[in-house]
């Protein structure tokens, strides 16, 4: 490795630390969050793992001394809601944690890796807060945090390299389809993100008028009428990048409606988490995840997520990127 490349990588590593430290500090303050320790794995039969679109299989292993099969978490969407109850948080207090996951079935490209690192967060709220206005208020706080860190990182490393608007643009998934009826959901995201630079698409899960779904969502945690994705336009790659997904969590009624719609009722009787929802034992919350590596990639204006995180990539893939001057960590 040449000295110039080594210096570049060292600067990137320092910048990653700066981004993560600054973001966590402002994020916790703006949303009234306390940092907690989170599990790397959970019991396979507990129902606490996130099964995403119910097609991606969790990585599992057998723990001999426990005589149990454990699963590497795919996200902490369910665990966090239970943790707020167990840890005795008060109204409008919340938690955040470092979530490290392995998603063996994920795609591999410039923004996808089988290793996932994100800040998972959850806040205790009132049932009266289950509105789009409240969801948008939380989105604005998160976006404000991202914008603050962007300005500070630009001053330290790349002045005016990444420009984010002062405010984020909101749009419903159906409104987005009406705007671009001839495009696919991902194409709509790209066009709208390119136009506005930072967007939040809300109400994701149910079919649109066309019969298509904006993006497949698990029916078990977000209320599909009160959720959404925070997306930015990455000019270097000419690409829309989802930095965060979040939502107000399901009530008993939401859960029944959504699982019936998704035809995922079969395991409810034996699922600890499902039973807690059906028995109204979980608090009303809002929560989500923010991709750490994606945020770093975007703010540092990198072409590939592998420039800011260590994962495993095919050798021929790494060689091709190296020819383009992209060195993966």
Curated annotation (Swiss-Prot):
Keywords, sorted A to Z: Amino-acid biosynthesis, Asparagine biosynthesis, ATP-binding, Cytoplasm, Ligase, Nucleotide-binding
Disulfide bonds: none
Single Gene Ontology MF annotation: ATP binding
EC class name: ligase
UniProt entry tagged with the keyword Cell membrane: no
GO BP annotations listed: L-asparagine biosynthetic process
Pathway in which the depicted protein is active: Amino-acid biosynthesis; L-asparagine biosynthesis; L-asparagine from L-aspartate (ammonia route): step 1/1
Swiss-Prot/TrEMBL catalytic activity: L-aspartate + NH4(+) + ATP = L-asparagine + AMP + diphosphate + H(+)
GO CC annotation, single: cytosol
Localisation per UniProt entry: Cytoplasm
Keyword Cytoplasm attached: yes
EC number from the UniProt entry: 6.3.1.1
Predominant location category: cytoplasm
Family: Belongs to the class-II aminoacyl-tRNA synthetase family. AsnA subfamily.
Protein name: Aspartate--ammonia ligase
């Amino acid at each position: 490795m040449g000295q110039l490349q080594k210096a570049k990588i060292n600067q990137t590593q320092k910048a990653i630390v700066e981004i993560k430290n600054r973001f966590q500090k402002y994020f916790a303050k703006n949303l009234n969050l306390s940092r907690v320790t989170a599990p790397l794995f959970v019991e396979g039969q507990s129902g606490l793992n996130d099964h995403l679109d119910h097609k991606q299989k969790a990585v599992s292993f057998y723990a001999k001394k426990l005589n149990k099969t454990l699963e590497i978490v795919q996200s902490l969407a369910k665990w966090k809601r239970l943790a707020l109850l167990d840890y005795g948080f008060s109204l409008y207090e919340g938690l955040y944690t470092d979530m490290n996951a392995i998603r063996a079935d994920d795609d591999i490209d410039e923004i996808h890796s089988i290793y996932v690192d994100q800040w998972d967060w959850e806040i205790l709220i009132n049932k009266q807060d289950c509105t789009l206005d409240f969801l948008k208020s939380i989105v604005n706080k998160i976006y404000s945090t991202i914008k603050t860190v962007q300005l500070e990182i630009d001053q330290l490393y790349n002045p005016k390299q990444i420009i984010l608007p002062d405010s984020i643009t909101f749009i419903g998934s159906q409104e987005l389809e009406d705007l671009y009826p001839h495009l696919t959901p991902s194409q709509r995201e790209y066009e709208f993100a390119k136009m506005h630079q930072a967007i939040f698409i809300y109400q994701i899960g149910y079919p649109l008028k066309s019969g298509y779904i904006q993006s497949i969502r698990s029916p078990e945690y977000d209320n599909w009428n009160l959720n959404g994705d925070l997306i930015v336009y990455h000019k270097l790659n000419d690409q829309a990048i989802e930095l965060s997904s979040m939502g107000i969590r399901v009530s008993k009624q939401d859960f029944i409606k959504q699982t019936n719609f998704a035809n995922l009722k079969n395991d409810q009787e034996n699922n600890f988490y499902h039973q807690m929802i059906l028995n109204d034992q979980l608090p009303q919350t809002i929560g989500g995840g923010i991709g750490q590596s994606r945020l770093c990639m975007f703010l540092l204006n990198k072409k590939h997520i592998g420039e800011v995180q260590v994962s495993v990539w095919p050798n021929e893939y790494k060689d091709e990127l190296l020819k383009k001057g992209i060195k993966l960590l």
